């Protein structure tokens, strides 16, 4: 377990504040002090417990809004009902991680090189503590060859029972479930650990899970697509760099892309299917391994995590039919053809956002810097000009702008990761950082079992009749 203990501490003895701290509004949270992650949380948790206690005591009866019938039968969209500390989604500005926008995170979070993409480790620290970790040569992903034999014992045997024809997400979830045997929370709960200390084994499990996922995910990839030969971890690399390496991609630009990809896909507040599922299952005191496996099954749905693969497949269908040098007029015709056939144009629109997704924007900037002449990137750029006006003309779409999925597949494809069915696994590895961080705070704050009230259509009809009389 030494490997996972060192991961949870990130081997950080951090001292110097980031040089751009004062230029970013949200850095009122202050830079991290010279404490390891566990110690910082131990200091922060009592303060936040008192804050929550005061909030409940003084404002517990304050109404946050009105629940309508549309909300009840429309997937609870727009209904405020979850406490989620790690991020907040603004319809116009996009996601903020502990108050920091994506561009701000790119400025202040440490990178593998000066000016490079943020390290996922830095974002993990930010989500857990609300503080920006200082740039340090010691802030890296400490890998140890011991993870490979441990993985082979726990995961490779169950995964060998999966058919190669099983979708990658099925195999990935199987691997996560196989890791559950090492849950510290389950062991501690069975021994009667007091509720006030639930967060500590949850912390161990969550950080252990996050650390192991690149190995599990890369094994799934190489088992399905590369004949099953695993690649040893490289203990000189960070989390994102090692994930790229384990998959078989050692290009520096691909490693930078993986750092960016994991960071921007890590969290998107608590109402989306995967995040809500993880929170819901964990509210029953299921350990982080079980809770995250449940979240992955939600992520595997076509309306959630499968969208990124569908975008790339749709873009390739455009190229197959019209060629790489398609004009904007031809593209308009193809978009209308898609819509008139009863299908949607994947990668556009969002349940909450009402402007272009900042996660799309930062990926576009990455493409302009590293692959400006890629044919599929040029096609994505044309789609940005063509699709929103058409969707606006239809009048049925609240947000006609591109989301994160409109771009990610093209970037991965450029560097050789062309297997679209695997993309959701990458999403899953990324999302573990947000879900795992919030699960720790769920237990630290003592959040209760989730149990909303359900109704029947008959009861709704009866209520509405009484309200109208």
From Swiss-Prot:
Enzyme Commission number(s): 2.3.3.16
Family statement: Belongs to the citrate synthase family.
GO CC list: mitochondrial matrix
GO aspect biological process, one term: citrate metabolic process
Additional remark text: Citrate synthase is found in nearly all cells capable of oxidative metabolism.
Class of this enzyme: transferase
Annotated Pfam families: Citrate_synt
Pathway recorded for this protein: Carbohydrate metabolism; tricarboxylic acid cycle; isocitrate from oxaloacetate: step 1/2
GO molecular function list: citrate (Si)-synthase activity
Gene3D superfamilies listed in its UniProt record: Citrate Synthase, domain 1 (1.10.580.10), Cytochrome P450-Terp, domain 2 (1.10.230.10)
NCBIfam families hit by this protein: cit_synth_euk (TIGR01793), PRK09569.1 (NF007128)
Subunit structure: Homodimer.
Active site (record annotation): 304, 350, 405
Name listed for the protein in its UniProt record: Citrate synthase, mitochondrial
Keywords from the named record: Mitochondrion, Transferase, Transit peptide, Tricarboxylic acid cycle
Subcellular location: Mitochondrion matrix
Main location: mitochondrion
Residue stretch of the organelle transit peptide: 1-28
Reaction equations catalysed: oxaloacetate + acetyl-CoA + H2O = citrate + CoA + H(+)
Lineage: Eukaryota, Viridiplantae, Streptophyta, Embryophyta, Tracheophyta
């Amino acid at each position: 377990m030494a490997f996972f203990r060192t991961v949870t501490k990130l081997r950080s003895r951090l001292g110097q504040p980031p040089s751009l701290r004062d230029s970013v509004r949200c850095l009122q949270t202050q830079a991290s002090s010279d404490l390891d992650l566990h110690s910082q949380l131990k200091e922060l948790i009592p303060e936040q417990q008192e804050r929550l206690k005061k909030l409940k005591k003084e404002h517990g009866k304050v109404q946050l809004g009105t629940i309508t019938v549309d909300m009840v039968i429309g997937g609870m969209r727009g209904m405020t009902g979850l406490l989620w500390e790690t991020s907040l989604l603004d319809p116009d500005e996009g996601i903020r991680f502990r108050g920091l926008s994506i561009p701000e995170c790119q400025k202040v979070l440490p990178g593998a090189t000066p000016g490079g993409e943020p390290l996922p480790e830095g974002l993990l620290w930010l989500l857990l503590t609300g503080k920006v970790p200082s740039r340090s040569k010691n802030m890296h992903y400490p890998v140890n060859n011991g993870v490979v034999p441990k993985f082979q014992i726990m995961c490779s045997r169950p995964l060998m029972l999966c058919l190669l024809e099983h979708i990658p997400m099925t195999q990935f979830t199987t691997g996560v479930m196989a890791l559950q045997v090492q849950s510290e929370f389950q062991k501690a709960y069975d021994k009667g650990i007091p509720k006030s200390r639930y967060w500590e084994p949850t912390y161990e499990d969550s950080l252990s899970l996050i650390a192991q996922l690149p190995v599990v995910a890369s094994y799934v990839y190489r088992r399905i697509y590369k004949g099953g030969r695993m690649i040893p971890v490289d203990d000189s690399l960070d989390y994102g760099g090692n994930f790229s390496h384990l998959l078989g991609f050692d290009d520096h630009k691909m490693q930078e892309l993986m750092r960016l990809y994991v960071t921007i896909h890590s969290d998107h507040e608590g109402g989306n299917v995967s995040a809500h599922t993880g929170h819901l299952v964990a509210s029953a005191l299921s350990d982080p391994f079980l809770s995250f496996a449940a979240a992955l099954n939600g992520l595997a749905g076509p309306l959630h995590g499968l969208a990124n693969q569908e975008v790339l497949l749709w873009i390739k269908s455009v190229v197959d039919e019209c060629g790489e040098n398609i004009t904007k007029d031809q593209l308009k015709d193809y978009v209308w053809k898609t819509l008139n056939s009863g299908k949607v144009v994947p990668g556009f629109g969002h349940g909450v956002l009402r402007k272009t997704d900042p996660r799309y924007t930062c990926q576009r900037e990455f493409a302009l810097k590293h692959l400006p002449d890629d044919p599929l990137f040029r096609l994505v750029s044309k789609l940005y000009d063509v699709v929103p006006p058409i969707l606006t003309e239809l009048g049925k779409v609240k947000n006609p702008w591109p989301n994160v999925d409109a771009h990610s597949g093209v970037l991965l494809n450029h560097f050789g990761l062309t297997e679209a069915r695997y993309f959701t696994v990458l999403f899953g590895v990324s999302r573990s950082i947000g879900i795992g961080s919030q699960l720790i705070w769920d237990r630290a704050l003592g959040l209760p079992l989730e149990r909303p009230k359900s109704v029947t259509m008959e009861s709704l009809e009866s209520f509405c009749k009484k309200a109208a009389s």
